[in-house]
Regions:
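Polybasic, lysine-rich low-complexity intrinsically disordered segments
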Residues: 3-4, 13
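Metal-dependent phosphoesterase signature
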Residues: 75-114, 122
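Short, acidic loop-to-helix structural element flanking the phosphoryl-transfer center
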Residues: 21-22, 100-128, 134-139
């Protein structure tokens, strides 16, 4: 096998495939792309559900509920969703808990920090987008 094989913007070498993009700016999603946040989201979700007398959700259920922001997560997790009379209180409890516990188990995926540092060291601009509420993204 050849030492280096290229395919569009990827190179395969002894270490595996390496992406060889050359953009000025790179934009990444936060949850589930750069950071593994599922554990803290599930813990805060279950804290809020428990505090309001609702059944807790498994990690797999929360994984399926994630997407389109934390309000949508809680809409899916709370029995009856937005129609539940305790929705707003439960959602507020979730937000309050998450603000204090969003770094309990959250961590970057393997290789993320090295990739970001590599981009920065090459003078590239890096941005993060998230549909998570602003205050929660700042600590992360």
């Amino acid at each position: 096998m050849e030492k280096n094989v290229t395919c569009d913007s990827m190179t395969r070498n002894d270490k595996g495939w390496e992406v060889q993009f050359n953009y000025d700016t790179y934009v990444f999603d936060l949850d589930g792309t750069l950071l593994s946040t599922l554990g803290d989201l599930a813990a805060s979700c279950n804290h809020a559900l428990r505090a309001n007398g609702m059944p807790e959700r498994t990690i797999d259920e929360v994984r399926r509920f994630v997407g389109n922001g934390v309000k949508k997560l809680m809409e899916r997790a709370i029995p009856g969703g937005l129609d539940n009379p305790l929705f707003e209180k439960t959602f507020a409890d979730f937000r309050q808990h998450y603000m204090h516990h969003n770094l309990d188990t959250t961590c970057p995926y393997p290789g993320v920090m090295e990739m970001l540092e590599s981009l920065r060291s090459r003078g590239k601009k890096v941005a993060v987008v998230s549909n998570k509420f602003y205050a929660a993204t700042q600590a992360l």
